[in-house]
Amino acid sequence: MWPGNAWRAALFWVPRGRRAQSALAQLRGILEGELEGIRGAGTWKSERVITSRQGPHIRVDGVSGGILNFCANNYLGLSSHPEVIQAGLQALEEFGAGLSSVRFICGTQSIHKNLEAKIARFHQREDAILYPSCYDANAGLFEALLTPEDAVLSDELNHASIIDGIRLCKAHKYRYRHLDMADLEAKLQEAQKHRLRLVATDGAFSMDGDIAPLQEICCLASRYGALVFMDECHATGFLGPTGRGTDELLGVMDQVTIINSTLGKALGGASGGYTTGPGPLVSLLRQRARPYLFSNSLPPAVVGCASKALDLLMGSNTIVQSMAAKTQRFRSKMEAAGFTISGASHPICPVMLGDARLASRMADDMLKRGIFVIGFSYPVVPKGKARIRVQISAVHSEEDIDRCVEAFVEVGRLHGALP
């Protein structure tokens, strides 16, 4: 007779490889169920393959003919600018493909320091620090800066990277209603017991195209002794008279404490993000921000492209000035046709449709007519608020914009979105 429970172990013994296969089969079943649920809800996100450079005119795999691109963050059209490309090639030749290191070991080159200094000058701040992306900048900031003694007050529609970054910190968390200054004031009053109070907001909200009321936010922050943080990914390079962003547009550059933004949209479109603000804060981030400490340095070619993009922007504001008229042309024509366009005076122009399947099907039919746009639905936007987000670029022509509107009208009528 076998001792103890050995006989039970023998009875239920399964070879290790078979147990692993069983676990994998279980995982596959769970994942397939999740994926089928996404498809069934009409929120499946497919990835179109572009076979050309980024720009207003592109080629898409499986689609014949040229395509007009109205869904890129390439606001200034600099991603394919010849001087930007040449600067990237020059940096690649001079500094190599990459650093194979994090910044504090052997991953800092002169071009990294030069770009950080240039970013600080551009935003009129004391210092700046580069990250692989603005998602990383947001992930690194709050945890390094805020302690359990502090509080962060966040707009409910802030970008996912801000929300995720705030989740990582140990500060007390308050969420105020979108753009609701009365609610923000109530939350600031409630947060008076904490050491530091940081108001966190997008400058321009990426899904709605609306702009934070920075003057009111800064006024409340001053009244209640709070700091102001702003994510400028959808503003840097093209909002404000010289493209400095939302704080320049609204005349509060000296009142916003911290700015996070990206090199991956208007400033060349490659990748990279940054924080700019007080010198001691940037120094602390170099010591404490985990995405900075544990991620490889930005590749030299990316740094070279972004640096040249900033040079072009600081040298002339002609490109910036062309944005407003083109944005207004699209918005006014679409609204005259009967569409509802969210936001105001921003090149992000969300065509509000409500139904996820409708947004997806209309986007597919737009592509058949040579217009590349994307339908956005839950969880990227709230349920019942699906939309097609159109983004205007400085390099779109008036003819491009008119062609896009004509296609929307045709497809809208086809799907019953217009009478």
From Swiss-Prot:
User: Which Gene3D superfamilies does the protein's record reference?
Assistant: Aspartate Aminotransferase, domain 1 (3.90.1150.10), Type I PLP-dependent aspartate aminotransferase-like (Major domain) (3.40.640.10)
Assigned GO CC terms: mitochondrial inner membrane; mitochondrion; nuclear speck; nucleoplasm; nucleus
PROSITE patterns found in the cross-reference section: AA_TRANSFER_CLASS_2
Its GO biological process terms?
amino acid metabolic process; biosynthetic process; threonine catabolic process
Residues that the record marks as modified (N6-(pyridoxal phosphate)lysine) are: 265
Task: Cite the EC number.
Answer: 2.3.1.29
- What range does the transit peptide cover? 1-21
Q: Which cofactor does it need?
A: pyridoxal 5'-phosphate
Q: Which residues bind substrate?
A: 159, 389
Principal EC category:
transferase
Task: Determine the domain of life of the protein's source.
Answer: Eukaryota
Q: Which residues carry this modification: N6-succinyllysine?
A: 45, 187, 326, 368, 383
A Pfam family hit: Aminotran_1_2
Catalyses which reaction? Answer: glycine + acetyl-CoA = (2S)-2-amino-3-oxobutanoate + CoA
Name the organs or tissues of expression: Strongly expressed in heart, brain, liver and pancreas. Also found in lung.
Q: Which residues carry this modification: N6-acetyllysine?
A: 45, 187, 383
- Please tell me where this protein is predominantly located: mitochondrion
> InterPro entries of this UniProt entry?
2am3keto_CoA_ligase (IPR011282), Aminotrans_II_pyridoxalP_BS (IPR001917), Aminotransferase_I/II_large (IPR004839), AON_synthase_class-II (IPR050087), PyrdxlP-dep_Trfase (IPR015424), PyrdxlP-dep_Trfase_major (IPR015421), PyrdxlP-dep_Trfase_small (IPR015422)
Annotated localization: Mitochondrion; Nucleus
**Which keywords does the record carry?**
Acetylation, Acyltransferase, Mitochondrion, Nucleus, Pyridoxal phosphate, Transferase, Transit peptide
Binding residue positions for pyridoxal 5'-phosphate = 134-135, 206, 262-265, 295-296
Please report which protein family the annotation says this sequence is part of. Belongs to the class-II pyridoxal-phosphate-dependent aminotransferase family.
Q: What does this protein do?
A: Pyridoxal phosphate (PLP) dependent enzyme, which catalyzes the cleavage of 2-amino-3-oxobutanoate to glycine and acetyl-CoA.
Question: What name appears for this protein in its UniProt entry?
Answer: 2-amino-3-ketobutyrate coenzyme A ligase, mitochondrial
Can you name the source organism? Homo sapiens (Human)
